[in-house]
């Protein structure tokens, strides 16, 4: 929970910066949406804990940014990209949310990042881990504050290549994070030389 609180504190500082001033603070209230998983497989790791961390960070920051009060709302994206995207679109278009935080699971995080860019708002992603968030889908409106598949695959992959492993088999989770992890790990192995075999 402390790491989420640190993310929110950094996000609040970001929102107060001149760069973030270009993304409008609407209605004289800084409205933060915690878009998290409250009911699916990431609920225990995020969910209520993420909401509590955001609330603690807002309190620690004094409840204001640039003299404007901070309001926190929360929604459950149910680990479903369409549900998450509909919530985020409604928040930006109707509820005047200025920033979305958390967003566990890459399959939800990627479309939220794209929408955030289109709406010129702020997305502090501490939940999705696909390297595509800061790679092919990179956005100036999204801060990726977590591990990613590039770092995970490079640490483990390079260590195993150095140890002499020469044949690799992947059992891959069939979703955005799993596919990105396999791709990034396979690239590590291929970059190690022709003697390596990826199956």
Segments the model singles out, each with a brief description of its role:
Residues 96-196:
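Extracytoplasmic ligand/sensor domains, especially the bilobed periplasmic-binding protein
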Residues 20-34, 63-70, 161-166:
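Immediate post-signal peptide segment of exported/extracytoplasmic ligand-binding proteins
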Residues 29-47, 104, 166-171:
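Short beta-strand segments enriched in small/hydrophobic residues
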Residues 29, 45-50, 60, 64-136, ...:
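Beta-alpha junction/loop-to-helix N-cap segments that form part of ligand/metal-binding clefts
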Residues 1-21:
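Gram-negative bacterial Sec-dependent N-terminal signal peptides
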Residues 53-62, 182-187:
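Short, well-ordered amphipathic alpha-helices
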Residues 41-52, 176-180:
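Glycine- and acidic-residue-enriched helix-capping/strand-helix junction motifs
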Residues 48-56, 140, 151:
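A general alpha-helical scaffold signature found inside nucleotide-binding enzyme cores
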């Amino acid at each position: 929970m402390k790491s989420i609180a640190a993310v929110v504190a950094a996000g609040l500082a970001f929102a107060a910066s001149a760069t973030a001033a270009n993304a409008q603070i609407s209605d004289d209230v800084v409205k933060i949406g915690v878009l998290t998983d409250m009911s699916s497989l990431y609920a225990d790791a995020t969910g209520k804990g993420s909401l509590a961390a955001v609330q603690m960070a807002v309190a620690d920051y004094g409840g204001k940014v640039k003299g404007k009060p901070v309001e926190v709302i929360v929604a459950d994206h149910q680990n479903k990209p369409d549900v998450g995207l509909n919530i985020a679109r409604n928040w930006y278009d109707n509820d005047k949310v200025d920033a979305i935080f958390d967003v566990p699971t890459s399959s939800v995080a990627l479309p939220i990042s794209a929408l955030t860019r289109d709406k010129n708002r702020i997305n502090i992603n501490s939940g999705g881990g696909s390297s595509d968030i800061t790679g092919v889908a990179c956005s100036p409106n999204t801060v990726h504050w977590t591990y990613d598949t590039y770092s995970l695959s490079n640490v483990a992959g390079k260590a195993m290549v150095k140890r002499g492993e020469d044949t690799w088999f992947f059992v891959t989770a069939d979703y955005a994070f799993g596919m990105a992890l396999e791709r990034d790990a396979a690239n590590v192995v291929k970059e190690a030389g022709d003697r390596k075999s990826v199956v």
